């Protein structure tokens, strides 16, 4: 297994923000040319990132034959869209290195638990918007997620919201307009990839 750490920060990122990759070593004796890659976003209410939803989960995906990566994204005091842009940078990085890493570029999946599920789903609904590609100065095609795994995700900012997550995510942007924008069940569109959702 090849393990590396990559800088995926933007100007509002926290110092610890990074992507850790867990790539299955390529072997001529194994007939698999490329593998899917899962980018994991641990939960933590946008207050911290939970280690129990990081490496242990990544290793389970590796054991099942997937490449994996963990995004240790920026949380409070960082606000929307800092973590979203870090996830976009991570998808861009994986797709740019797909040939070298033996990743199937059409099977890059974002996964998230709890608030990390909100981040993964946010990426699923916002990846094609101009503010993402313009900020990274890349084409939208390279940012496209091919699927989502949403593990007990925070989704709604409405009646059943996990208020702490939205307080931490929005902080001084905590307005009705931004609550509506980040209530992801209201943002589903034709660009959203297929999702596996479990609770």
PLM features: residue spans?
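N-terminal cap/lid segment of alpha/beta-hydrolase-fold proteins
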Residues: 1-33, 159, 163
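Primarily recognizes the serine-hydrolase "nucleophile elbow" in alpha/beta-hydrolase
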Residues: 92-163, 179
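Catalytic nucleophile-loop/oxyanion-hole region of alpha/beta-hydrolase
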Residues: 49-51, 70-105
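Short beta-strand element of the alpha/beta-hydrolase
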Residues: 34-43
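Conserved serine/cysteine hydrolase catalytic core
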Residues: 183-192
